[in-house]
Amino acid sequence: MIYAAEEVRARFARRGLSFDPTVEEIVRGILEAVREEGDEALDRFSRDLDGYPVEEVPKRAWREAYEDLDEDLRDALETARERIEAFYREEARGGFLRAEGGGVLAQLVRPLERVGVYVPGGSAPLLSTLLMTVVPAKVAGVREVIVASPPKVHPGVLAAAWVAGADRLFAMGGAQAIAALAYGTGRVPRVDKIVGPGNRYVVAAKRLVYGTVGIDGLAGPTETMIIADGSASPRLLAADLLAQAEHGPDSEPWLLSPDRALLERVEAELSWQLQDLPRAEVARQALEKGGLVLTKDLEEAFALANLYAPEHLSLALSDPLPWLEKVQNAGGVFLGEGSPEALGDYIAGPSHVMPTSGTARFQGGLAVRDFLKVIPVVGLSEGAARELAKKGALLARAEGLEGHARSLDLRR
């Protein structure tokens, strides 16, 4: 269906994360039980919900899974890891130390000690998710990266753990896995931060443990938005929309263009390509969540995109680079038809863990900085302290904090 811009504007403006109180109540009970009972509760929930007790998978099993992979797939995993590493090594992460009046001001940058990575289970093994989360953490210098994935862990996930350089891997899933990582049990160490996507129970658990540990964000269904002009290929546009639509029925694929003829050709192409797509029914449901939008011009298309704040924004334009300055809100941007979002899912370089549900308005994609913390250091000389103490005391008294002011008065 082709929408007018005004038909979707209000919908785009209302976007945000929503949470099911029934799910949160269930998850809260799981978290409390694991926090209080440790491994006993962890195993109980794992048996009841996944059919297996929790176990740590030894590294020899990872190596064997890697060696059993098809040679071409091994090569693809290695290439993906190399590109992810290279991309994130470019990210600035150094602190500074500046001399000032006989003293110093400094900023220390330190990696987190221990990070938990959640890799969902299900019918499709998410090898790429493991690479896209573990590799940036290791580039940042995280000492120990612990992977959690539901039992039985797919051999492809084990192989990816070997390639990515993870440190430990537990066969555990769901809210109970998040609880174990957040609180620690006899077998599972407590981590400093939990990253990675999951179902609504995992997302609810991450939300509830935030504050006990850090989290990367709260992921909703995947979404893609393409802005296209008349130079774009309807065949490629339809394929790119379906690539995201097949993720799940709640995915949102959108195409924005001022060219009605292009939108009509894409609509016809979608019908044609759906005929032999294995996940056609899922994709059809997702296409109903998104749609094709006719805009007045490209300026209006970019205004709508910034309002929507998509996880993925593709610019299928004859000359996309000059339009990059118009992008304010997006998890990741893909320039031109030669840079499809599907490449970003696997091997382009940046992590595919990106903000959804409009949270790209205030949050970026997973990166090295998510595994670092900044510690400011103040070391002033007596002279500098004396010079600043009077003004500092004035500010303290303006806030009604006399104890602060007296502490500073003693330095004058």
UniProtKB/Swiss-Prot annotation:
UniProt cofactor note: Binds 1 zinc ion per subunit.
Any Pfam family hit: Histidinol_dh
Example GO BP: L-histidine biosynthetic process
GO molecular function term, any single one: zinc ion binding
Pathway: Amino-acid biosynthesis; L-histidine biosynthesis; L-histidine from 5-phospho-alpha-D-ribose 1-diphosphate: step 9/9
Keywords, alphabetical: Amino-acid biosynthesis, Histidine biosynthesis, Metal-binding, NAD, Oxidoreductase, Zinc
NAD found in the keyword field: yes
Cofactor field: Zn(2+)
Catalysis: reaction(s): L-histidinol + 2 NAD(+) + H2O = L-histidine + 2 NADH + 3 H(+)
EC number: 1.1.1.23
Active site (UniProt): 311-312
Residues that bind Zn(2+): 244, 247, 345, 404
Residues the record lists as binding NAD(+): 118, 176, 199
Entry GO terms, CC: cytosol
PROSITE patterns: HISOL_DEHYDROGENASE
SUPFAM superfamilies with a match to the protein in the record: ALDH-like (SSF53720)
Residues annotated for substrate binding in this entry: 222, 244, 247, 312, 345, 399, 404
Similarity field: Belongs to the histidinol dehydrogenase family.
Function: Catalyzes the sequential NAD-dependent oxidations of L-histidinol to L-histidinaldehyde and then to L-histidine.
Entry-linked HAMAP family: HisD (MF_01024)
Protein name: Histidinol dehydrogenase
Organism of this sequence: Thermus thermophilus (strain ATCC 27634 / DSM 579 / HB8)
